[in-house]
Amino acid sequence: MFQVLKFCWKVLCFIRDLVMNVVFLGFVLLLVAIISFSSGGKKSTALTSEGALLLNLDGYLADNRDETLRWQDALSELNGEHVPRKISTFDVVFAIQQAEDDPKIKGLVLDLNYFEGADLPALDFIGGAISHFKDAGKPVIAYADNYSQGQYYLASFADEIYLNSIGSVDIHGLSQENLYFKEMLDKLAVTPHIFRVGTYKSAVEPFLRNDMSAEAKANMQRWLGEMWNNYVLSVSENRNIKKDRILPNAKQYLAELKALKGNSTAYAQQRGLVTDVVTRLDLDKKLSALFGKGSDGKANLIEFDDYLTQLPDRLEHYNVPNKIAVVNVEGTIIDGESDEENAGGDTIARILRKAHDDNSVKAVILRVNSPGGSAFASEIIRQETENLQKIGKPVIVSMGAMAASGGYWISSTADYIIADSNTITGSIGIFTMFPTFENSIKKIGVHADGVSTTELANTSAFSPLAKPVQDIYQTEIEHGYDRFLEIVSKGRQLSKTQVDKLAQGQVWLGSDAFQNGLVDEIGSFNEAVNKAEQLVNQRQDTAVQDFSVEWFTDDNVSLISTLLSDTKKGAQEQLVKWLGLPAPIQKLQKELNILTKFNDPKGQYLYCLNCGKVK
């Protein structure tokens, strides 16, 4: 009788889940149809006369484009919430480049009020496009009510910077802080079994210590200090002011602010950080005088999103004979398929194989923006880049904000590596982490017991890890580290001894990595394109004049699966909001959430935990 009831209950649960999923899917399809219909009927704003491009970046920058922006915008409109958007850095640069040659576009306006900032390499890339735009004789104006450090860095590329009359410029330097869990694990009686190689492999320190080791701190202080020097130097050159005008020491800063009776707006003016202070109305009058008025009586501007819809799609593929394929590897490298935040080894390998099989593809640019992740998935990706090289297709790596640990593993054997001066790279090291809870469950009166045929059979999380098993894990990790050294040695044409001195988990900034031979050139994505063309022509009797740069993406990803993934992510974020968790608890949850991304089949990771938190 019990079995019958159990079976009936399972059937009812299945029917319930099926009905709920069908209803939800129907709702999603209906909403997509409504969005498509409404956007199809809505005409894109276009300049009817000469005006300026308004670069109103409402959100944060990433390499990959969010294909569900209309969906996200519609949901934001429905629930009345402002949700920051994911904006592709490459779309921004593409729009600026097109505007430079557009006779109707007479200038560029940076509205940075809702821009959430980005890493310095992305800002440098956009800044380079802005500088080129200015060289064409077109003015660039930047405005924000208040400037964060990242917003101001981008604004510094403009001809003129305007600040609201009660605004401020928040430049404070760079810092990085990690959470450490050893005491918490001790209180919970969790035993973390850590197997690693590398003096500076700080990825696992949070589970072994309550503070940062002296070696990790020295390494971080070096590259963080260099990054800050690069920030100050760039702003100084862009604004044509002395470096010591950017940020004085704390004592001098306070003295100047007190002398101005705490007026941070006047302080920004006095330091030469802004051109002038204005009200919003004053700014519109100034822009109207420069670019004319539109039909609404305001300055004649076309918004970034509207302008982008009038341009050819950057992701469009064309039937041309000479292509340079671009493949993005963005986020933590995981085993399996990619999602919105992670780069799946199987997905990236499939895209690279597509470029391999396409005879029109002459070279591949691997765009890497990753702190690493699964050792297995990283090697699957690297093997596909080698397959491209074996058939004569050069592979050029363009590093973004970071290409560390697994991100460097997949880069190291490329034909040529280009990094930004502020790219975080290196972190050559490997680890395995295996926690056991035998003491935790004892505290609540639970015990684990059983039998095994050998000492190696029981790797339960509720039993102590046998010494032979621990020795096996450590031996495999040491082999993994040696393999890392071999790969880098082969790819960079350095001895293993030389690589080992640069390895041990040390993090390097792009400029130092260049000096040490870990990268070939300091430059942007544009230099990667130029190098790809050069390498192709070096291998051919007849030089190719025209190349088509095309982004290769995964054909297997459907809009519905992306929408469902985004909906799930949004629901998780909404749950955190509804719970009303304090900010420190939310930060703790995010830190620990990193562990959920770890899915390597052998539990081996090439990951730089400390590479993405500079603020």
UniProtKB/Swiss-Prot annotation:
Subcellular location: Cell inner membrane
GO biological process: signal peptide processing
UniProt GO cellular component terms: plasma membrane
Enzyme class at the top of the EC tree: hydrolase
Topology, Cytoplasmic side: 1-17
EC number, as in UniProt: 3.4.21.-
Membrane topology: Single-pass membrane protein
Family indicated by similarity: Belongs to the peptidase S49 family.
NCBIfam families with a match to the protein in the record: SppA_67K, SppA_dom
UniProt protein name: Protease 4
